[in-house]
A protein has these predicted regions:
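Catalytic-core regions of core metabolic enzymes
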Residues: 1-122
Length: 122
């Protein structure tokens, strides 16, 4: 739930988790700003992806978030292969689908979320 996300992010940081993915939609912008400032000040080694993001996928290697693994084509030795960074979850899924239809592999796809205060930006 959006109200619980800030506390969960900070709990993960306090536990020493270095990479936190928050897929939760609807986290108030002021809470996002407070959490991001706290992470920068008190937990500089913790990287936040999100909130309101689909996460990160490296087909065949890892999938952290809510991106369906079948939607992305595996990277190939011969290529072509691409990486994707996107603010829109829907457009991320569409890009993955279109690339797979054209036999273009994806090395890594990162959805950073479209909220005003993303934990990770371009």
């Amino acid at each position: 739930p959006p109200k619980a996300a800030p506390a969960a992010i900070l709990e993960a940081a306090r536990a020493g988790i270095g990479f936190v993915v928050c897929i939760t939609e609807g986290v108030p912008a002021q809470d996002e700003a407070r959490v991001f400032a706290t992470l920068q000040r008190d937990f500089p080694k913790t990287r936040l992806l999100g909130p309101n993001c689909p996460g990160i996928i490296s087909p065949g290697k890892c999938n952290i978030g809510i991106t369906a693994g079948e939607i992305a084509a595996l990277p190939t030795a011969k290529g072509p292969n691409v990486g994707i960074v996107s603010r829109s979850g829907t457009l991320t899924y569409q890009a993955l689908y279109e690339l797979k239809q054209r036999n273009i592999g994806v090395s890594t796809c990162v959805g950073i979320g479209g909220d005003p205060v993303p934990g990770t930006s371009f």
